[in-house]
């Protein structure tokens, strides 16, 4: 849940300004109020106590009336974005209260209003460029409804499902910065990872969204629960931005599961698609290998594609056509990469325009980006690629707006809109005339000073200006006898007197009036320009989406060329064939060695591969590479293989490694079993499953039993999902003899005496050894320990051979029951294995050894 700022201000608050503050604070009691006073945003009372240490600013005080002081702190208005981000990141909402009238024109207290409430989900500035910042809402009736929006870009999506499991999977993909929930859903454990905001149920019943998007009414009928979530989301957007029309939100998109692969959080994590499990951010992920995007919105789109592979063959082929066109046209690809380096974030610029926060520099960035479009259209038209020419219409129609902005905005414009100097000379005749008067003032003052020196004979006479007295004539006391009678004394200094004249006062009013008028007129004309841009939001965002796609296709083509990828052959169903496949991430990180490629063939007849071999030999890398190659193909990317034929997978499931989930109170084994259960519940004939060491989180026989049963279950399914199953339980390799769909693979190892070399090559057949001691040696375990391990291993292997049944399987019944006919451990061995040595005194240990020796002798004599 979000932290809350609870108002505990002094009960007096008798000054008019503090009364105004108290009234406005009551409108946002759960937010820290940034109260605009001149050039600062001030915080008072409990808000100040809370904010000061987080913002690392001084906590002071202010008279609140009745002789009492109230805690206070403040931040400069021009640097507010950074301070907002700090508070929001710390879990607080911030209400931004502005002066909404000119202080000079105000009668009494300046009118102030809350113009925005900033929370994690409504933050629009200081965001990660290549990541979305989603605000989400959930609603539940018979189905579950989810709506999410990035208010900084305008992307708005709804999703409806019968399954809470699928809903939480989708939530884990979008990772909302803030989640809106009705009160009855708040306490459920599913929402723990998110910043929660409680909403009244009635806010989900508003019809403002339907009234706004009348042309999309079919969505309200097709996805009624999801659209109620969207209603609640829209109401929150309007409440947190009063008076703002979010015109950059142009439509509501429906997420349809039949169009995109739903990746569960374990698969996204295990495959390290966009985030590294080693906590290094993007480094070491699939995204890091494929991302050659140059634009922020292209980077966000690529991330979305990686997390949402396609299921429709036609859409996949269309993407592959675009990528292939850019692979083949290296000149076009290079020119596009260079051109995209000049493109700013159109989506977020339009978000700022929509929210009324875009300044002159933002419009200049917009103009520069729109100015690139003619060159881009020419490149696409002249290039060899007919598919890419389909983007040209989306890039047309904005040249006049680009020209207007280019002619209007001053490249040296300040950040503040109230400081003037926003517009270029020549854009407005009236502004040019007023500027002429203002700039001509310096020449007029110099001329007046020269004339007065000549007229009075006072050579030290000066004409100057300050903000308190305006223009003045300064004469030293030594020349006081030469002062003309018409001079009017204004100020006495230690060594001089300052005077004004009617002529000087008249010109002062003319100059200062011109400067004030220029500032006001520039501000008004800038607002008109911004409204003109807002009016073109649909066209600008259409161009932005086209640019994002082209940037992503260019990025995928660049990755394909640099890493020597090939175009996959896509099939609706059937067998999976990968010739000389490589792991895209591992390959990219190798410095001095080349990656060893491997083949993969999974058919409907042979669909489950049991993979054995030692640790560090490459089993996990091999399995992950197969999953990544399939995923890459389904986002429309070329793949790291000499050749690949890919049947479209509706799911990619992975069970790779596990650790305790302390927050949920679940052990490693429980987490592992939950993941396996999830896979078995959702698997289909089109699924690809990666299972690594199922059952190792518990006792040996328990783990072996579960791994065995899971393999049999998948092999016996009518749907026959394609499965790669790595295991250290060598007993499982016998399943090849009784289940036609199962076959064995192992990782090649070359032995040189006591040394081993991992070949990283996947070979048909089973591994006969695990080479655990050799791996331990490579890891640097002490030599005496390794020697002892060899002795124990030899004894255990000998014991196992003697106790093992002559036949593990009953061929006629073809059942796995004989697995459990393995003789149990000898009682003495069992007793020793369970002995708590550390709890024995030296004398007790010695006595126990003598006793054990006598019992063994007695047993041998039987």
From Swiss-Prot:
InterPro entries xrefs: DNA_mismatch_repair_MutS, DNA_mismatch_repair_MutS-lik_N, DNA_mismatch_repair_MutS/MSH, DNA_mismatch_repair_MutS_C, DNA_mismatch_repair_MutS_clamp, DNA_mismatch_repair_MutS_core, DNA_mismatch_repair_MutS_N, DNA_mismatch_repair_MutS_sf
Any Gene Ontology CC annotation: cytosol
GO terms classed as biological process: mismatch repair
GO terms assigned for molecular function: ATP binding; ATP-dependent DNA damage sensor activity; damaged DNA binding; mismatched DNA binding
This protein's UniProt keywords: ATP-binding, DNA damage, DNA repair, DNA-binding, Nucleotide-binding
Binding positions for ATP per the UniProt entry: 613-620
A Pfam family it matches: MutS_V
SMART domains: MUTSac, MUTSd
Domain of life: Bacteria
General function of this protein: This protein is involved in the repair of mismatches in DNA. It is possible that it carries out the mismatch recognition step. This protein has a weak ATPase activity.
Sequence similarity: Belongs to the DNA mismatch repair MutS family.
Annotated protein name in UniProt: DNA mismatch repair protein MutS
Lineage: Bacteria, Bacillati, Bacillota, Clostridia, Eubacteriales
């Amino acid at each position: 849940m979000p932290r809350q700022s609870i108002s505990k201000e002094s009960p007096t608050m008798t000054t008019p300004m503090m009364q105004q503050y108290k009234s406005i604070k009551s409108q946002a009691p759960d937010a820290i109020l940034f109260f605009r006073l001149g050039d600062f945003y001030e915080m008072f009372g409990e808000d100040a106590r809370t904010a000061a240490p987080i913002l690392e600013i001084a906590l002071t005080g202010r008279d609140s009336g009745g002789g009492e002081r109230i805690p206070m702190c403040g931040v400069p208005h021009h640097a507010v974005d950074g301070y907002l981000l700090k508070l929001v990141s710390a879990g607080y909402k911030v209400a931004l209260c502005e002066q909404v009238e000119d202080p000079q024109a105000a009668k009494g207290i300046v009118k102030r209003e809350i113009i925005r409430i900033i929370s994690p989900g409504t933050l629009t500035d200081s965001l990660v460029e290549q990541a979305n910042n989603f605000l989400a809402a959930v609603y539940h009736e018979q189905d579950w409804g989810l709506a999410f929006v990035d208010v900084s870009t305008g992307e708005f999506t709804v999703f409806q499902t019968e399954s809470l499991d699928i809903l939480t999977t989708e939530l884990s993909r979008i990772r909302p910065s803030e989640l809106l929930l009705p009160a009855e859903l708040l306490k459920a454990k599913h929402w723990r990872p998110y910043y929660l905001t409680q909403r009244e149920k009635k806010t989900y019943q508003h019809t403002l969204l339907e009234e706004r998007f009348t042309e999309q009414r079919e969505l309200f009928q097709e996805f009624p629960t999801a659209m109620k979530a969207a209603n609640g989301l829209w109401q929150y957007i309007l409440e947190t931005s009063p008076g703002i029309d979010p015109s950059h939100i142009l439509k509501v998109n429906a997420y349809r599961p039949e169009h995109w692969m739903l990746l569960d959080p374990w698969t996204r994590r295990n495959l390290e698609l966009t985030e590294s499990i080693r906590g290094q951010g993007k480094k070491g992920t699939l995204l890091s290998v494929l991302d050659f995007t140059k634009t922020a919105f292209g980077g966000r789109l690529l991330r979305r594609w990686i997390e949402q592979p396609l299921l429709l063959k036609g859409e996949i082929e269309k993407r592959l056509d675009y990528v292939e066109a850019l692979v083949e046209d290296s000149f076009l690809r290079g020119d596009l990469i260079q051109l995209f380096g000049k493109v700013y974030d159109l989506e977020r610029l339009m978000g700022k325009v929509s929210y009324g926060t875009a300044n002159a520099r933002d419009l200049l960035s917009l103009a520069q980006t729109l100015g690139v479009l003619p060159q881009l259209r020419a490149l696409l038209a002249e290039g060899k690629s007919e598919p890419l020419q389909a983007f040209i219409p989306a890039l047309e129609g904005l040249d006049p707006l680009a020209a207007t902005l280019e002619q209007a905005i001053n490249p040296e414009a300040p950040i503040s809109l109230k400081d003037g100097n926003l517009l270029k000379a020549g854009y407005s005749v009236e502004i040019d005339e007023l500027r002429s008067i203002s700039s001509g003032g310096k020449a007029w003052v110099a001329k007046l000073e020269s004339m007065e020196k000549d007229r009075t004979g006072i050579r030290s006479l000066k004409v100057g200006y300050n903000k308190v007295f305006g223009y003045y004539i300064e004469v030293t006391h030594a020349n006081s006898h030469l002062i003309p009678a018409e001079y009017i004394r204004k100020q006495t200094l230690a060594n001089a007197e300052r005077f004004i004249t009617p002529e000087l006062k008249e010109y002062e009013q003319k100059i200062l009036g011109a400067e004030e008028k220029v500032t006001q007129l520039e501000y008004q004309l800038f607002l008109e320009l911004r409204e003109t841009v807002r009016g073109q939001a649909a066209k600008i965002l259409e161009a932005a989406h086209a640019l994002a796609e082209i940037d992503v296709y260019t990025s995928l083509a660049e990755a394909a060329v640099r890493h020597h990828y090939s175009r996959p052959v896509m099939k609706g169903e059937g067998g999976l064939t990968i010739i000389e496949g490589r792991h895209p991430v591992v390959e990219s990180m190798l410095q001095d060695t080349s990656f060893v490629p491997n083949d993969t063939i999974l058919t409907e007849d042979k669909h489950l591969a049991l993979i054995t071999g030692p640790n560090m030999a490459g089993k996990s890398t091999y399995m992950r590479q197969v999953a990544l190659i399939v995923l890459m193909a389904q986002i429309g990317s070329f793949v790291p293989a000499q050749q690949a034929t890919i049947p479209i997978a509706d799911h990619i499931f992975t069970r790779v490694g596990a650790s305790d989930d302390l927050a949920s109170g679940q052990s490693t084994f429980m987490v592992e079993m939950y993941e396996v259960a999830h896979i078995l519940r959702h698997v289909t004939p089109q699924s690809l499953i990666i299972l690594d060491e199922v059952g190792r989180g518990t006792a040996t026989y328990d783990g072996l039993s579960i791994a065995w049963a899971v393999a049999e279950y998948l092999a016996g399914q009518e749907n026959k999902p394609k499965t790669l199953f790595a295991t250290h339980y060598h007993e499982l390799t016998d399943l090849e003899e009784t289940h036609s769909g199962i076959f064995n693979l192992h990782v090649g190892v070359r032995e040189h005496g006591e040394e081993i070399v991992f070949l990283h090559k996947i070979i048909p057949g089973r591994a006969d050894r695990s080479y655990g001691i050799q791996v331990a040696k490579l890891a640097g375990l002490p030599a005496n320990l390794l020697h002892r391990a060899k002795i124990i291993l030899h004894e255990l292997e000998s014991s196992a051979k003697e106790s093992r049944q002559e036949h593990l399987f009953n061929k006629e019944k073809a059942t796995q029951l004989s697995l459990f006919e393995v003789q149990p451990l000898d009682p003495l061995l069992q007793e020793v294995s369970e002995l708590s040595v550390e709890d024995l005194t030296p004398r007790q240990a010695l006595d126990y050894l003598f006793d054990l020796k006598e019992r063994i002798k007695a047993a041998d004599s039987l």
